[in-house]
UniProtKB/Swiss-Prot annotation:
This is Exportin-2. Its main location: cytoplasm. The keyword Transmembrane does not apply. It comes from Bos taurus (Bovine). Gene3D superfamilies: Leucine-rich Repeat Variant. Found in a complex with CSE1L/XPO2, Ran and KPNA2. Binds with high affinity to importin-alpha only in the presence of RanGTP. The complex is dissociated by the combined action of RanBP1 and RanGAP1. Interacts with CFTR. Residues 29-102 form the Importin N-terminal domain. Belongs to the XPO2/CSE1 family. The keyword Transmembrane does not apply. One of its GO terms (biological process) is protein export from nucleus. GO terms for cellular component: cytosol; nuclear envelope. The modification Phosphoserine is found at residues 112, 931. The modification N6-acetyllysine is found at residues 574, 824.
Length: 971
């Protein structure tokens, strides 16, 4: 694409269309942009539009499109073509910083994100002048430019907070510190001076405080991994100024908005984070500053209001106290009884109250409320911070703290009892306080794993939780109902089983509650209870114990999906999946009705898939329905095909990318259920599965390979006779997969199925070419994963076609190649093979090479016979060699570029481990002994001589053990 006015005009028109609400106009425009984004100059055209276009909407659209383009395409993925040509990459890096800094803020943010994406890949090695260019802009004095630099630096450096320590990371941080720490410190001091100069200028202060927030965030990122020498030397400057800012109160920066945090609150929040970081990680160096910060933050807490805009500030301030009180160094600051009482009264209890804003979120923004309360994303809430502070104080003062707070709990419950309809918030706070007190350690998966023994959880459950849940009106006091259900979920490992069993029908009843939070919590609680394990690792609750409630459970779960706001509720669908899994055969009578409802739901959500977890659990539930029913009645598979195939066809025809990998997995499960040949409905699909476009999406690959394997397992003869012209296409797929380091193992899965199941004559003409392709890949790019897969394949080939056939095909490609493969690959690398089935295949294959390949006994290959036997005994007896060369450590990590749908494995569509050797060989060691005995009878005297003269003593001892176990000898 040329950088021409005509192309700019065309691009403008298509960008306009991508904003059209009508899908008939929008989607073709999106498809067009996708189709041209591989062309040279495409990204430069977008950047040119940012400079030249007069239409601000188009400029914003171009900036978002550019950022998403960079996100999808900048990373260079090994084995895949470079999606952006080098000239475009150079031009982008040369222009983007200047363009970003000269753009309005809305566009600046998009370009800043794009720079951070590029920087993540290219900085510092491929973009060494980025920092210099950014730091030089600090001299401009223009805070629009300076804030653009700071925002970009923050995007670039914030990953230092999450990266694992490594020499490479520390080298990069040191490079950044050398270039950036001093200019940042000078800018910090200069900005604070300007704040004093412009103390009465509200608009100037807003810009300056935006800078201070970004500077404080950068301080956090640059200090997170370790305390840099520069910041240790300049701690006085930073901490004194942080303390000053923490105590600052400028009326010009106060906002009337009760919801949105202002600049002053955001800055103080970040300073609390910075102080907490130093208190936790660098307490020795920070010790002399700590008392001043404790005092300042305490004063902040007792003087800050309950408005939502202060939530982040208050939670960060409390988190600071929590991090301090957990450190043995600072224990003395909290041990006084009056201090503990004061903290409880002035900080913890007020911040555990259920405010009007919380009530509003509970009723009107339930999804966000659930995300915060149930999923642990409440990290910046007052309640979560107060809970963490209770936990921190209990570390050293469990007895006194429990005593003080128990008094508050009793008092709150008494207030509630006086007038429940008015005082229900007191009980809510009491439940939360008990939860905080009792929870010493907690995980998402298991609930509370360590509890405060001073709190009687069962007694509290019986007296204060159960009565609320037993109330006939499921819609009364919804917040308390949600609290009670959450209590069961959190303390499920502490409350005795008999009480949990009593709770199950109550929870089922609450699936009918109108409140989204209540019926969601009920579904979540049931799902968690159904996954609990008893002492023998079986589920704590048996299908028989839940049997009395099966019908009402299933009815209420599916009805809950029809309640307003819960049509795609992932917790309900997960509970449906878990109920199916627990109840097994008990659900069979209901499946005809349930599969209809699931299919209708699938059709509805396929129009616009927006809830990935819901969709995943829905497909899991479909798989469970198939598995459970067809286990006792395989013929019922036809009913599922009738119910599902119309919807599946629509999904495939409409190219619903999110669902296609799931559809293939369910189809594999259905096809594998057929015991005889492949039905014609599947064979009609077979040619379409080989289309290259399907294989372009990495998320499709595992599911497609599994489906092709199912075709080969169930219908290899049909494919050989009715679709022989498709075999080259099948091998073309294999060729594409083995060329990729990320997907070569999938190529071998497919190849192994072809070798195992296809009639030999149907692949005869392709065999040599298959081996040539494998040797080319070995030569060009040998990885441990590839070697392991290659070893399994050649041994499977040996089992299927015979040892002599393997030797002949190798030597047919190149004379003496068989010996090279033995010497360079099989003997030295066999120890790396892992997995019971894989080891068994290799053991049986190598046994065949040792005992059924005449050239091994009477040619130049004979010298390799004993080393091969030694390596096989090593495979049996030595630990697996799991060493991986340094440069390969990350090859196996599947990195899905850009926005491509990642593959999500359906647990209940899982394929049983297939053993191609099967009953033919039960014990490979005995099989080796018997095969060696048979060989020794054919050529008496040779085998004992070769074994006794060349095998090492330890291996010989193991071999004698195998011979004894098989009751045979070598003649």
């Amino acid at each position: 694409m040329e950088l021409s006015d005509a192309n700019l005009q065309t691009l403008t028109e298509y960008l306009k269309k991508t904003l059209d609400p009508d899908p008939a106009i929008r989607r073709p425009a999106e498809k067009f942009l996708e189709s041209v984004e591989g062309n040279q100059n495409y990204p430069l055209l977008l950047l040119t539009l940012l400079e030249k276009s007069q239409d601000n909407v188009i400029k914003v659209c171009a900036s978002v499109t550019f950022k998403n383009y960079i996100k999808r395409n900048w990373r260079i993925v090994e084995d895949e073509p470079n999606k952006i040509c080098e000239a475009d990459r150079v031009a982008i890096k040369a222009n983007i910083v200047h363009l970003m800094l000269s753009s309005p803020e809305q566009i600046q943010k998009q370009l800043s994100d794009a720079i951070s994406i590029i920087g993540r890949e290219d900085f510092p090695q491929k973009w060494p002048d980025l920092l210099t260019e950014m730091v030089n802009r600090f001299q401009s004095g223009d805070f629009h430019v300076i804030n653009g630099v700071l925002r970009t630096a923050h995007s670039l450096f914030k990953r230092y907070r999450h990266e694992f320590k490594s020499n490479e990371l520390w080298t990069e941080i040191k490079l950044v510190l050398d270039a950036f720490a001093l200019p940042l410190t000078n800018l910090f001091k200069a900005t604070i001076e300007l704040c004093s100069t412009h103390a009465n200028d509200a608009s100037a202060l807003r810009i300056l405080f935006s800078s201070l927030i970004l500077i404080s965030k950068l301080f956090y990122s640059l200090n997170f991994q370790d305390l840099p020498e520069f910041f240790e030397d300049n701690m006085e400057t930073w901490m004194n100024n942080f303390h000053t800012l923490l105590t600052l109160d400028n009326k010009l920066l106060q906002t009337d908005d009760e919801e949105e945090a202002g600049l002053l609150e955001l800055l103080k929040s970040q300073i609390c984070d910075n102080a907490a970081l130093y208190a936790q990680k660098y307490d020795e160096e920070f010790q002399r500053y700590l008392p001043r910060f404790v005092t300042a933050i305490w004063n902040l807490l007792v003087t800050t209001g309950q408005e939502v805009k202060y939530d982040l500030l208050v939670s960060n301030a409390i988190q600071f106290l929590a991090s301090v009180c957990e450190r043995p160094h600072y224990k003395n600051l909290f041990e006084d009884q009056n201090t503990l009482t004061s903290i409880c009264e002035k900080v913890i209890v007020p911040n555990m109250e259920f405010r009007a804003a919380d009530e509003e979120a509970f009723e009107d923004n339930s999804e966000e409320y659930i995300r915060r309360d149930l999923e642990g994303s409440d990290i910046d809430t007052r309640r979560r911070a107060a809970c963490d502070l209770v936990r921190g104080l209990c570390k050293f003062f469990e007895g006194p703290v429990t005593g003080i707070f128990s008094g508050y709990v009793n008092s709150m419950l008494q207030e509630y009892a006086k007038n429940p309809s008015v005082n229900w918030k007191h009980k809510d706070a009491a439940i939360y306080l008990v939860t905080s007190l009792a929870s010493k350690a907690q995980t998402q998966k298991h609930g509370i794993t360590q509890a405060n023994e001073l709190v009687n959880l069962t007694e509290f459950f019986v007296n204060h939780i159960l009565p609320d849940l037993k109330s006939a009106n499921v819609n009364e006091f919804p917040v308390l109902k949600a609290d009670g259900i959450k209590y069961i979920t959190i303390f499920r490992n502490q409350v005795p089983k008999e009480h949990l069993l009593v709770s199950i029908p109550l929870l089922i009843n609450h699936l009918q509650a109108e409140s989204i939070v209540v019926h969601t919590y009920a579904a979540h609680a049931l799902e968690r209870l159904f996954t609990m394990r008893g002492p023998n690792s079986a589920t704590l609750f048996t299908a028989a114990e839940i049997a009395p409630f099966v019908e009402i459970l299933l009815t209420n779960l599916f009805k809950a999906l029809t309640l307003p706001g819960s049509s795609e509720n992932e917790y309900i669908m997960k509970a449906i999946m878990r109920s199916f899994s627990l109840l097994q055969e008990a659900i069979i009578p209901y499946i005809p009705t349930l599969i209809t409802q699931l299919t209708q739901k699938l059709l509805a959500v396929s129009k616009n898939p927006s809830k990935p977890h819901f969709n995943h659990y829905m497909f899991e539930a479909i798989c469970l329905s198939i598995r459970i029913t067809c286990k006792s009645n395989p013929a019922a598979v036809v009913n599922f095909e009738e119910a599902l195939f119309l919807v599946f066809t629509e999904i495939l025809q409409n190219d619903v990318q999110e669902f296609i990998p799931y559809v293939f997995q369910v189809m594999s499960l259905l096809l594998e259920t057929h015991k005889n040949d492949i039905p014609s409905s599947y064979m009609a699909l077979f040619p379409h599965l080989l289309q290259p476009v399907l294989w372009e999406r990495t998320g499709n690959i595992p599911a497609l390979v599994r489906l092709l394997q199912a075709f080969l397992e169930r219908g290899s003869n049909t494919i050989a006779s009715a679709a022989a012209d498709k075999i080259p296409g099948l091998l073309g797929v294999f060729q594409k997969l083995i060329a990729s380091k990320a997907n070569d193992h999938q190529g071998f899965y497919l190849l192994n199925s072809i070798i195992e199941h296809m009639p030999p004559e149907s692949v005869d003409q392709y065999r040599k070419q298959i081996f040539i392709l494998l040797f080319q890949r070995l030569q060009n790019s040998k990885t441990t994963k590839f070697i392991k897969s290659f070893l399994v394949f050649i041994n499977l080939y040996c089992i299927k076609y015979g040892a002599l056939a393997l030797q002949e095909i190798f030597d047919g490609i190149q004379p003496k190649m068989f010996g090279m493969v033995l010497e360079k690959i099989i003997i030295p690398e066999i120890q790396k093979v892992s997995g019971n089935v894989e080891k068994k295949i290799c053991a049986v294959g190598i046994t065949k090479l040792l005992t059924e390949c005449p050239p091994m006994m009477d040619t130049e290959y004979t010298k390799l016979w004993t080393p091969l036997l030694q390596s096989l005994i090593g495979l049996f007896e030595l630990p697996e060699d799991d060493t991986i060369p340094d440069e390969e450590h990350f090859i196996d990590i599947e990195d899905t570029p850009g926005y491509q749908t990642a593959f999500s494995q359906l647990a209940f569509a899982g394929k049983k481990e297939h053993d191609p050797v099967g009953q033919m060989v039960n014990n490979p060691k005995i099989h080796l002994a018997q095969s060696l005995h048979k060989l020794s009878t054919a050529c008496p005297g040779r085998v004992p001589s070769m074994v006794s003269t060349s095998l090492n003593a330890e291996a010989l001892q193991y071999l004698q053990g195998y011979l004894q176990a098989a009751s045979v000898t070598l003649l």
